[in-house]
Amino acid sequence: ISSSKPNLTVSNESHDISKLSPTKTSTVSIDAELVAQVGGSQIALYDKSGDAFYDLISAFHKSVRGSDPDAALYWYARILQGGGDALYVGRRLLAIASEDIGNADPRAMQLAVNAWDTFHRVGPSEGERAIAQATVYMALAPKSNAVYQAFNKAKIVAEQTSTLDVPDHLKNATSDITQALGHGDTYRYAHDETNAFAGGENYFPQALAQAKGYDTNFYKPTERGLEKQLKDKLQYLNQLNRESNDQRY
């Protein structure tokens, strides 16, 4: 910084400003270390839109995913220290709840929503702590990305088979014409079936259900948390489908 007014000259060897001459035009070299010494505090390594911001968020997310509540709280505090928005962290927790925890502990999603709501109701001081509470819970919750992976697979297959028509038994008969076409005629109402499950029914387009090369078993539950029970339930339903004498196709 150049100036025609009396100025400070700072060298790498000394930051003693009392020895600087006030009579000469000088160049001041200011770095984070100097400002920290003069101001008596450190400068947080953070900016709200650059790499440092995304690195901190990444460290936070990976700490929660890695089940380390202490590290997650540390990076959360670093984000706040640098002037970051606690609600951004709250949004990230909502993403973590579905991406990294999923059905292993569905309560994680509700806790993230509750933390978000608490922040808006009571303000930053108490709200930041609510987000910290959700952070700790999610870090220690059982982990599963089975839903995340299943949805990605479903989107790929849906894109590749987007021209397939909805099967007639799944269509809604909304007019005399659609009724005449037989829409919904052979639909099996699950509540009227044993255990409210229509064994052997198929809810995919016939061409997709019978096509080779497509794995439509998108959701593969883990053995962790509540998802273990969902896995057992899914295996039971699949068995009923295989053993049914009333196969759709």
Language-model-detected regions and their locations in the chain:
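Accessory helical-bundle/CTD segments and flexible terminal tails appended to RecA-like ATPase motors
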Residues: 198-200, 204
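Conserved C-terminal "switch" segment of AAA+ ATPases
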Residues: 2-10, 22-28, 45-50, 100-107, ...
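Conserved C-terminal helix/linker of AAA+ ATPases
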Residues: 2-42, 87-93, 150-155, 166-169
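Conserved helicase/translocase motor-coupling segment
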Residues: 33-36, 40-78, 91
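Terminal-proximal interaction/regulatory segments of ATP-powered molecular machines
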Residues: 66-191, 195-197, 210-211, 217-249
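Short linear motifs in intrinsically disordered/low-complexity regions
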Residues: 8, 13-17, 32, 203, ...
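Extended, compositionally biased low-complexity polar/Lys-Gly-rich tracts
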Residues: 23-46, 214-230
